[in-house]
Design a protein with these regions (language model features):
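N-terminal transmembrane-helix/juxtamembrane module of multi-pass inner/ER membrane proteins
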Residues: 1-41, 70-100, 180-190
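Hydrophobic alpha-helical transmembrane segments of polytopic
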Residues: 33, 59, 63, 130-133
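Generic transmembrane alpha-helix motif of multi-pass integral membrane proteins
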Residues: 43-47, 115-118
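Active-site-proximal helix-loop elements at catalytic-domain edges
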Residues: 64-80, 117, 122
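Membrane-embedded catalytic cores of phosphoryl/pyrophosphoryl-handling enzymes
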Residues: 87-190
Length: 190
């Protein structure tokens, strides 16, 4: 039982967050690594919607459910983020409000999982490439003390459940056509 707990709540001995905060360049890298995944998800969303405009609604519903579920769980299943256990401060450039609740489940992991499952479902991006981009970013969040491994496992399960709920959503054709016209206009698609 101790082994399981030490695995699920593992943190590196070195305080990597403190190391990143010791130079201006590393601080900037920390902020970039925290937010770059959202730019990548925007790109994946674009590829998915371009393949089938109805996917927009699936992604939208998945994201709304994810935000509600994540916020609810982070208030109910509360353990402090590892960085606060080490008495580290949240780096400038991150939204403090988002980090003051519990760390379970990982919101980044929730979104990663449902985007991965949408990619598998609609085949718009290389799965190995997707995993090679997001896996280091997720592990980085454990390394710097934003999450424990158990938070990631909770995110995997939650993300899969959210995908199961949202993958069946199909809106009426006239709504989808209106959105397709807007999407094509914004992204200059003929």
């Amino acid at each position: 039982m101790n082994f399981l707990k030490s695995f699920l709540f593992w943190q590196p001995k070195k305080d990597w967050l403190l190391w990143f905060e010791q130079s201006l360049l590393r601080k900037k890298i920390l902020i970039i690594l925290n937010y770059v995944i959202w730019v990548f998800f925007f790109f994946i969303s674009y590829l998915l919607i371009r393949k089938d405009v109805n996917i927009f609604w699936q992604i939208l519903i998945a994201t709304i459910i994810a935000e509600i579920f994540e916020r609810f769980l982070k208030r109910k299943i509360y353990w402090r983020r590892p960085l606060f256990e080490k008495n580290d401060d949240l780096p400038p450039g991150l939204v403090k409000k988002w980090y003051k609740t519990g760390s379970f489940p990982s919101g980044h992991t929730i979104k990663t999982v449902y985007f991965l499952l949408f990619i598998i479902q609609y085949q718009v991006f290389s799965i190995p490439l997707f995993l090679s981009i997001v896996s280091p970013l997720l592990f980085f969040r454990i390394l710097i003390g934003f999450h424990y491994p158990i938070d990631m496992f909770g995110g995997i399960i939650t993300g899969a459940l959210i995908w199961l709920l949202s993958k069946w959503i199909i809106l009426p054709i006239f709504i989808t056509q209106i959105f397709k016209t807007i999407f094509n206009f914004i992204f200059f698609i003929d």
